[in-house]
């Protein structure tokens, strides 16, 4: 009964039942409402022009408002924002009804990442947007706790790259300029305008949160790719980052994303030494994993624990695994939660208990799918007894397609 609020997850659900790529499906929100020990479920499409006019990736090309809105949903300043990284955000209400386009009173005229960060100390929402076709290839934005866009900065990059995620700390933002490079010549042959080109190098850009392009310090790292980050924080003259890092990347259809062990992410730690101008890089575990999360009240601060979804690699194609992982980040020690045989996991979202006494006093929520029975369910796991059976399972009255990211919104 302490768990009261809305769990909502976004994902790709093409109206026709078919899409050329799983990234192109229409955004559908799946909401589970919890109150007084009872649960109810609702699902809704995000009614953007992409949905209303039955558009596809080509017919919506160049229209920032025509968003699939299919990747994430984030709560900030009383608004729920449905996000997809090549488009503007769309606002929905807690009943999952579409409210309309959110361009911050006309101040946002570029795409917005699906992975903004809300600072737990200031309430600010920080985000970026990247462009595949025209300079500036990267823009940075800062939104006040009241929802006003108060800063925008153009950031210089030598070439257009896919920048899916990033990092923040108490005083800095960290951009990841990694070598998935936009090249429209690839689209005809691979179905994706991106290619992995390690010869372009990889680097991390550190900028004060209220800084601009001239303040960015770039630090070279080994070529790699990171779809998602756990967290980052400052410690003396260093910035410590925990990421799901893969040595290489493949970005065609979902089957083509998996090209062997080097294309699967694992937990790594990067330590940026601001005084020496260096970066140390260290793999902490062999477990294949992605979709990392922490307790959101520690975003940009030192978090002891991180949670992620296992990726199954002992099959021909990359598959959502049967386990969730809880990491003690500093040591890399891992605790596994087995969801069940032939159960496909989902992103683990942390929901804190009211007035917690420690960081992991709460629950992990994950929307999972039993492959044989086609039963979807929301599992609720005690984060402090992570390897034990779930404290509750909520059966969803219909199959929920595999999806992406979600949020817990406490009442």
Enumerate the predicted regions with their spans.
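Beta-propeller domains
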Residues: 1-411
């Amino acid at each position: 009964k302490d768990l009261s609020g809305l769990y909502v997850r976004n994902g790709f659900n093409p109206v026709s039942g078919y899409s050329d790529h799983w990234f192109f499906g229409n955004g559908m929100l799946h909401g589970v409402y919890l109150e007084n020990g009872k649960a109810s479920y609702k699902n809704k499409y995000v009614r953007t022009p992409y949905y209303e006019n039955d558009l596809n990736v080509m017919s919506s090309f160049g229209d920032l408002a025509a968003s699939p809105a299919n990747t994430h949903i984030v709560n900030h300043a009383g608004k729920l924002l449905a996000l997809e990284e090549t488009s503007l955000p769309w606002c929905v209400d807690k009943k999952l009804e579409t409210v309309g386009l959110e361009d911050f009173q006309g101040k946002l005229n570029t795409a917005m990442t699906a992975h903004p960060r809300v600072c737990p100390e200031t309430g600010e929402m920080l985000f970026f947007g990247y462009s595949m076709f025209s300079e500036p290839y990267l823009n940075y934005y800062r939104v006040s706790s009241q929802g006003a866009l108060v800063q925008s900065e153009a950031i210089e990059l030598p070439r257009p790259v896919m920048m899916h995620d990033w990092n923040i700390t108490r005083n800095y933002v960290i951009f990841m300029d990694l070598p998935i490079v936009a090249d429209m010549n690839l689209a005809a042959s691979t179905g994706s305008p991106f290619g992995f080109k390690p010869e372009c190098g990889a680097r991390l850009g550190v900028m004060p949160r209220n800084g601009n392009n001239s303040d960015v310090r770039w630090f070279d790292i080994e070529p790699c790719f990171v779809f998602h980050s756990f967290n980052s924080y400052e410690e003396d003259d260093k910035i410590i980052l925990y990421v799901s890092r893969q040595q290489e990347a493949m970005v065609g259809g979902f089957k083509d994303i998996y090209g062997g062990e080097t294309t699967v992410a694992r937990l790594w730690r990067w330590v940026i030494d601001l005084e020496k101008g260096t970066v140390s890089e260290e793999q902490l575990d062999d477990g294949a994993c992605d979709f990392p999360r922490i307790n959101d009240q520690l975003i940009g601060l030192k978090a002891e624990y991180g949670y992620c979804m296992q990726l199954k690699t002992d099959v021909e194609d990359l598959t959502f695994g049967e386990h969730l992982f809880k990491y003690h980040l500093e040591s890399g020690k891992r605790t596994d939660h087995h969801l069940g045989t032939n159960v496909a996991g989902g992103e683990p979202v942390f929901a804190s208990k009211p007035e917690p006494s420690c960081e992991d006093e709460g629950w992990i929520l994950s929307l999972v799918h039993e492959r044989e029975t086609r039963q979807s369910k929301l599992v609720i796991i005690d984060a402090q007894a992570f390897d034990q059976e779930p404290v509750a399972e909520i059966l969803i009255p219909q199959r929920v397609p595999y999806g992406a990211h979600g949020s817990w919104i406490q009442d």
